[in-house]
Amino acid sequence: QFIQGIVGQTLTVEEAYQLARQTGLFLLSVAKHQLGSLDRVEQIVKLVAFVRCGADFMQQPKVANGVSDLLVEVFGEQGKHARSAVGVAALPGGMCFEAELIVKTC
């Protein structure tokens, strides 16, 4: 389920953190489907997080932590990654959060 909203206006940072975490679970399900098993993940390389927010909102990293924290919980040291957390004015369908994940496999 995609949640619409603007972080810092219609959604709190904590709500957005939890939604980002759900996005992380979705990304892991896609990875498992594509790879056959998450055991094939050697390293989480990079996460790019897009947070829909107003121009004065500066807490994008706190929102992106929802995905980052999950990846470290699941993969330990292999879950530590480079990251960009970007604030944007709009996302498809009015979504509040979107993410891309780069994974190194074995």
Q: What is the predicted function of each stretch?
A:
Residues Q1-C106:
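Short, polar/acidic, helix-capping and beta-turn segments at strand->helix junctions
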